Amino acid sequence: MHTAYVPVPAPVRPPSAERWPLAAVAELFELPFLDLLHRAQQVHRQHFDANTVQLSSLLSIKTGGCPEDCAYCPQSAHYDTGVDADKLMPLDEVVRAARAAQANGAQRFCMGAAWRSPKPHHLEAVAEMIGAVKALGMETCVTLGMLRDGQAEQLKAAGLDYYNHNLDTAPEFYGKIISTRTYQDRLDTLQQVREAGINVCCGGIVGMGESRRDRAGLVAQLTNMEPYPESVPINNLVQVEGTPLAGAETLDPFEFIRTIAVARITMPLAKVRLSAGRETMSDSEQALCFMAGANSIFYGDVLLTTGNPQVEADRRLLQRLGMRAEGLPCAAGQA
């Protein structure tokens, strides 16, 4: 497959957030499923090509040994998950991975490091990686944990397009998942990113035992940011043996799709990213996510340390749906 890069327009900055009280978001979740999808698809078509998705690739540039105790995370040093801590990946390996992702059709390259917060020398190395990936013509995103004063500006100077820092869940449920980092810590980092002029990538995880009201609370937090994030990844919990959430009750797929739809309705200009958890979804469930307004997928066999549908399976799915990758002239995988 030929995957010559076609530039993608810069994201449209969302306007000042329309206020969505928690009660109004919760009402969306209560709509009949088909009514909710119809409304989400209408909103989606007002702002995007409904048959186009952006392909993103995610690379763990520093795996394991994280001091945080996020109950879902196999990279936490608090849990025995079989994930060993390693050092920061060398620049040449990162560039090689980015080239491979681009050759497979990805236009967006995300780099994640299992840190509580990056040290100055680490940030200098990441800045080099950002520059090298940007030189390939790819959109860049990093997730490095909490940022200290001046670090967001350093990343901006390196050319970073997006910084990912998820809220994970609603404030009311947050304490059941994480104790080593406060909700306000997350909001403070997001504010630094916004003030530095970097696009915000912020979403959450569902299927951690939260209620529907908690899922509404997460979306309400996101949509009422000023402005709401340009990029909203919605993750379905990937249960990893050794983490506290291993063995949690599996979320009804319709609830996950509802979350995608409500995110699309309340954040109409955002890229809503179908993120972790796709490996366990059927093709039909993924198609419903696209119907609900998801317009980006993470592409590649591994997301950080967890599985993801194989590249060829994604190509076949997009072909069957008559969808295409953003910036490419035809459905992914077609000649």
UniProtKB/Swiss-Prot annotation:
One of its GO terms (biological process) is biotin biosynthetic process. [4Fe-4S] cluster binds at C66, C70, C73. [2Fe-2S] cluster binds at C110, C141, C201, R273. PROSITE patterns: RADICAL_SAM. The keyword Iron-sulfur applies. It comes from the Bacteria. Pathway: Cofactor biosynthesis; biotin biosynthesis; biotin from 7,8-diaminononanoate: step 2/2. Disulfide bonds: none annotated. Its cofactor is [4Fe-4S] cluster; [2Fe-2S] cluster. Keywords: 2Fe-2S, 4Fe-4S, Biotin biosynthesis, Iron, Iron-sulfur, Metal-binding, S-adenosyl-L-methionine, Transferase. Its EC number is 2.8.1.6. SUPFAM superfamilies: Radical SAM enzymes. One of its GO terms (molecular function) is 4 iron, 4 sulfur cluster binding. It catalyses: (4R,5S)-dethiobiotin + (sulfur carrier)-SH + 2 reduced [2Fe-2S]-[ferredoxin] + 2 S-adenosyl-L-methionine = (sulfur carrier)-H + biotin + 2 5'-deoxyadenosine + 2 L-methionine + 2 oxidized [2Fe-2S]-[ferredoxin]. It holds the Pfam family BATS. Binds 1 [4Fe-4S] cluster. The cluster is coordinated with 3 cysteines and an exchangeable S-adenosyl-L-methionine. Binds 1 [2Fe-2S] cluster. The cluster is coordinated with 3 cysteines and 1 arginine. Residues 51-278 form the Radical SAM core domain. Belongs to the radical SAM superfamily. Biotin synthase family. Homodimer. Catalyzes the conversion of dethiobiotin (DTB) to biotin by the insertion of a sulfur atom into dethiobiotin via a radical-based mechanism. HAMAP family: BioB (MF_01694). This is Biotin synthase. It comes from Bordetella pertussis (strain Tohama I / ATCC BAA-589 / NCTC 13251). The lineage of its organism: Bacteria, Pseudomonadati, Pseudomonadota, Betaproteobacteria, Burkholderiales.
